[in-house]
Design a protein with these regions (language model features):
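C-terminal lobe and pocket-closing loops
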Residues: 262-324
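C-terminal motif of bacterial Sec signal peptides marking the signal peptidase cleavage site
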Residues: 17-22
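Ligand-binding pocket segment of bilobal, Venus flytrap-like solute-binding proteins
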Residues: 88, 189-281
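Bacterial N-terminal signal peptides that target proteins for export
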Residues: 1-10
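Extracytoplasmic ligand-binding site segments that recognize negatively charged/polar headgroups
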Residues: 131-135, 141-231
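Extracellular/periplasmic juxtamembrane helices and adjacent flexible linkers that interface
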Residues: 25-27, 32, 40-44, 174-179, ...
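N-terminal segment of the mature folded domain
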Residues: 29-168, 231-233, 244-250
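Sec-exported extracytoplasmic/periplasmic mature domains
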Residues: 62-74, 92-96, 104, 136-139, ...
């Protein structure tokens, strides 16, 4: 799906509202974000910036694009929401200038990306933080309490009916139907899958005997491509359950997840709580900011199934214009205005001021090798 020219802010006085299309769904973008984006340091002469990757970021990128293009009218941002794995591959192949990914580059990918960046450092910038919702479709039921091991058993296809005693034990006031559970997973390589399976591998114990992986590790009951595809599959069946970036949930039922002795519903604030409490990845350089999430937290305000999505870029580009465009656009993305635009449109958690300062310090160093 290509997100291009989502907004033409010919004049804010005339633009009472902006509707933008992302993956076939209309999104209303508050014109105030265009005004906020006017503080962006636009690139002289404009140009076209191409990115690809995370479908979880899709709606956020749409909001960023609309506001940024409104402020920098001679610049076009093209973002293809092909999924995190494909986005990383396109970046490594040099097909796009930046990538969006729900997982940071691993060691092998970093080596490949460094070669693509002609020997310059490649960095992971956590710019989009969102809960991963465990979403389901059961008539008359909007919310359920699910412990990590129960979620693991459901997606490992060991718990097969909604009125199973393990589900019923934590939902005594809910009349659970004798309906077959149909887990829905991503069919494509996905950072959302990698984050979700990383959580299960850490928190679900023996109920999830698989390692974290961007590819679903077992034979699926049902699978769909992209975040929108998973939501459509859940909506299309009764008894279905899946995992998806919270911005895509819509009217589906969602789970409150077991944390410590209680259950925590997803929210931007609850997602931010676990991110702020988690360290950066061991071995990061000064400019790299990949995060190691603490999935075993017992913090009662923290929602533990979180997607931290990154913008991946070279620290040096051969083409000066590309360097300027990446620097300008990513500066808006991590800015307070950009983060608020994303939060307003998707329910994502704005990054903290401390994180913003670190990311901006790295972005400020992006330049051209010639």
């Amino acid at each position: 799906v290509k997100l291009s020219k989502y907004g033409q802010f010919a004049g804010l006085a005339l633009a009472g509202s902006l509707a933008l299309s992302a993956c076939g769904s209309d999104q209303a973008v508050d014109p105030k974000h265009a005004a906020d984006a006017r503080n962006v340091d636009c690139v002289d002469g404009g140009g076209t910036l191409s990115g690809a990757g995370s479908s979880a970021q899709e709606n956020a990128v749409a909001a960023w694009t609309a506001a940024y293009e409104g402020a920098c009218g001679d610049t076009t941002i093209n973002y293809d929401a092909v999924g995190s794995g494909a986005g990383r591959s396109q970046f490594i192949d040099g097909a796009v200038t930046f990538a969006g990914s729900d997982a940071a580059l691993d060691k092998k990918e970093t080596e490949q990306a460094t070669e693509r960046c002609k020997g310059s450092e490649v960095v992971n910038l956590p710019a989009y933080i969102s809960p991963i919702a465990v979403a389901f479709n059961l008539d008359g039921i909007d919310s359920l309490n699910l412990k990590p091991e129960v979620i693991g058993d459901i997606f490992n296809q060991k718990i097969t009916k909604w009125n199973d005693e393990k589900i019923a034990a934590d939902n005594p006031d809910v009349e659970l139907p004798d309906t077959k559970i149909v887990p829905v997973n991503r069919s494509d390589e996905s950072g959302t899958t990698e984050n979700f399976t990383a959580y299960l591998a850490e928190a679900a114990g023996d109920a999830w005997p698989h390692e974290a992986d961007g590819n679903w590790p077992i034979k699926p009951a049902e699978a769909a491509q992209g975040s929108s595809g998973v939501v459509s599959a859940i909506q299309g069946g009764q008894g279905t359950i899946g995992y998806v970036d919270a911005s895509h949930v819509g009217g589906l039922g969602t789970a409150s997840v077991g944390v410590g002795d209680g259950f925590v519903a997803y929210s931007p604030e609850a997602a931010a709580a676990i991110v702020d409490a988690s360290p950066e990845r061991e071995g990061n350089t000064e400019n790299d900011h990949a995060i190691e999430l603490d999935y075993l937290t017992k913090e009662s305000s923290a929602y533990p199934i979180v997607l931290v999505s990154y913008e991946i870029a070279c620290m040096e580009y051969e083409d000066k214009k590309n360097a300027e465009l990446v620097k300008s656009f990513l500066s808006y993305v991590v800015s307070e205005a950009g983060q608020q635009a994303s939060s307003d449109e998707t329910g994502s958690a704005p990054i903290s001021s401390e994180t913003r300062d670190k990311l901006q310090a790295t972005i400020d160093k992006i330049g051209a090798s010639a």
